[in-house]
């Protein structure tokens, strides 16, 4: 699409004035996604060439946004959020692995943008995290394979700039793990608390998905991973938030309570270095 190409050139050369491009950015990318969308009931029939160009344009815009403009112009944040909302369909449901990777290439750009860590962080995270958790869940790839891939994530050089057309589920899982790792690794205490709360909401079945507490191994594994991958200085937030959820959530099922207690046991048994963990308060 010619208009998409022109927008990419503008974004590539734009050093400032992103606020003036926000409306055009939103309108062009949302229109391009509507053109690329499946015409029938089959969600795997996206025009992924157009979608890839949308994801590239999205990443260009959000990564080049000056932090000073982000703090003073809500319109930019709104435009970024609206386009991301439209892109969500590329990463959820019965789509192809290539479609998931295209979606993640856009999200990767967002996570390296100053807009991601503003006060809009809860909105952005609640949008992208359920899809990422779907991809690393046992419904996509068996837990033993995902757990093995997670052991190599910090050294994984996988790039989302060139999306392969024949990607297998394990490749997509690697990409999702890397995104989760990057987000956790750069989270401060406030953002980490929001991350834990959103993960619990996913496990509770509050994200238009069924509850995941029945899966003993995966629910424990994903919560323990939050501790393992978060910065040592703020990872104390994870067990404290879990205990708070355990004691303050009304009408919680016995299964949920059991899983949270099991998770605490796993965290403490592993003797992970947790700076600032007050065992008296925790108990």
Residue ranges of predicted features:
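Structural marker for long, regular alpha helices in very large eukaryotic proteins
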Residues: 1-9, 13-283
